């Protein structure tokens, strides 16, 4: 397919995958929860398009979770897009995506986020997406498992991709005002149109940019990138379900619950201040309830809180909210072992 002439069939193929991904994820999550079910609400956008939002509340595992599909189009692009891709100015646009955020009740099960999307505006098109994990009481083995499954998905297309997408995730899901990562990362990519360098982010001196420069000019076809989105999207359930199976019966006290709610506050801060998807949705008159379904049902803030030294909570704030080389840094096991947080 020519970079300058994406066909209408492209939209059909992507929509079929994204709606199927929503179906598969919802089915898998309902199976593991055992009690909660997703309630669907279809919606239409007055300016063009619509979607279907699915939310689970008060399940056995999930306190709240949402899996949304949207397909929207319009005449004029919002500033959040034009700032990144000014060549799209003046073109009608089309955007579709499936996004998900899950907030488990048990503090030992991480919050998780996924989003895969496709965009067209005249001759301009791109894929974006990724998945990231946000633990509260982290385990090194869980973190490594999540990363391993997503690395294998990237490697199935090309083994060089993960070297760019892993640090890009660390870079994107970073709370600049807190100087900490939102979680332990995963993968992230955006503005992938098959041309130029893989990294198209905003930090020319970051690790992702450096890795991308080392690869040089990198050509990927539309089908390559579509296959990447499919491989990564289908990697989600195998990356997350085993963590639930291992942690959902762990007991917890008010201390763990309060710390979970406190750390959920960081999730709220990122999504409302930094997340480009939230900003794009609000700037294009998207469905507010669907856009903000990523927020947890409960969260708390505490002025000046610091985790006690050498505590289980400090393991999160001192180690797991900083970008790490999860497989090659041997010191991580030494840091986790005193807290019984390796396995």
From Swiss-Prot:
Residues given in the record as a divalent metal cation binding sites: 103, 113, 147, 177
Signal peptide (residue range): none
An example Gene Ontology molecular-function term: metal ion binding
UniProt GO cellular component terms: cytoplasm
Keywords from the named record: Chlorophyll biosynthesis, Cytoplasm, Heme biosynthesis, Metal-binding, Oxidoreductase, Porphyrin biosynthesis
InterPro entries: Coprogen_oxidase_aer (IPR001260), Coprogen_oxidase_aer_sf (IPR036406), Coprogen_oxidase_CS (IPR018375)
Protein location: Cytoplasm
Record's keyword annotation contains RNA-binding: no
Gene3D superfamilies for the chain: Coproporphyrinogen III oxidase, aerobic
Catalysed conversion reaction: coproporphyrinogen III + O2 + 2 H(+) = protoporphyrinogen IX + 2 CO2 + 2 H2O
Cofactor: a divalent metal cation
A Pfam family of this chain: Coprogen_oxidas
Presence of keyword Calcium: no
E.C. numbers: 1.3.3.3
UniProt region (Important for dimerization), positions on chain: 267-302
Binding-site residues for substrate, renumbered to this chain: 99, 115-117
Pathway, per record: Porphyrin-containing compound metabolism; protoporphyrin-IX biosynthesis; protoporphyrinogen-IX from coproporphyrinogen-III (O2 route): step 1/1
An individual GO BP term: protoporphyrinogen IX biosynthetic process
Site for Important for dimerization, residues: 177
Catalytic residues in the record: 113
Family that this chain belongs to: Belongs to the aerobic coproporphyrinogen-III oxidase family.
Primary role: Involved in the heme and chlorophyll biosynthesis. Catalyzes the aerobic oxidative decarboxylation of propionate groups of rings A and B of coproporphyrinogen-III to yield the vinyl groups in protoporphyrinogen-IX.
UniProt subunit comment: Homodimer.
PANTHER family: COPROPORPHYRINOGEN III OXIDASE, MITOCHONDRIAL (PTHR10755), OXYGEN-DEPENDENT COPROPORPHYRINOGEN-III OXIDASE, MITOCHONDRIAL (PTHR10755:SF0)
Name of the featured protein: Oxygen-dependent coproporphyrinogen-III oxidase
Species classification: Bacteria, Bacillati, Cyanobacteriota, Cyanophyceae, Synechococcales
């Amino acid at each position: 397919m020519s970079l300058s002439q994406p066909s209408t069939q492209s939209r059909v193929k992507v929509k079929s995958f994204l709606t199927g991904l929503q179906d598969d994820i919802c089915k898998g999550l309902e199976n593991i929860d055992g009690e909660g079910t997703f309630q669907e609400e279809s919606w239409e956008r007055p300016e063009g398009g619509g979607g279907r939002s699915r939310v689970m509340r008060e399940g056995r595992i999930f306190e709240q979770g949402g899996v949304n599909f949207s397909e929207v189009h319009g005449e004029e692009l919002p500033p959040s897009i034009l700032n990144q891709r000014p060549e799209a100015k003046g073109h009608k646009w089309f955007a579709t995506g499936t996004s998900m955020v899950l907030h488990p009740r048990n503090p030992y099960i991480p919050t998780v986020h996924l989003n895969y999307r496709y965009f067209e505006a005249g001759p301009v098109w791109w894929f974006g997406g990724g998945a990231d994990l946000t633990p509260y009481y982290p385990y090194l083995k869980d973190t490594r498992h999540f990363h391993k499954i997503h690395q294998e998905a990237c490697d199935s297309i090309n083994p060089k991709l993960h070297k760019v997408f892993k640090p890009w995730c660390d870079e994107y899901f970073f709370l600049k005002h807190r100087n900490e990562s939102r979680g332990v990362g995963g993968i992230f990519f955006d503005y992938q149109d098959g041309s130029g360098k893989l990294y198209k982010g905003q930090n020319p001196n970051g690790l992702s940019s450096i890795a991308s420069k080392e690869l040089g000019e990198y050509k990927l076809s539309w089908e390559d990138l579509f296959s990447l989105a499919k491989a990564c999207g289908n990697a989600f359930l195998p990356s997350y379900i085993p963590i639930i199976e291992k942690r959902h019966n762990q007991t917890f006290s008010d201390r763990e619950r309060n710390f979970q709610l406190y750390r959920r506050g960081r999730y709220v801060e990122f999504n409302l201040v930094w997340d480009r998807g939230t900003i794009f949705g609000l700037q294009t008159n998207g469905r507010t309830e669907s856009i903000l379904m990523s927020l947890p049902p409960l969260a708390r803030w505490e002025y000046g809180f610091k985790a006690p030294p050498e505590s289980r909570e400090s393991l999160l704030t001192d180690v797991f909210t900083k970008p790490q080389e999860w497989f090659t840094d041997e010191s991580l096991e030494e840091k986790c072992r005193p807290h019984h947080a390796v396995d």
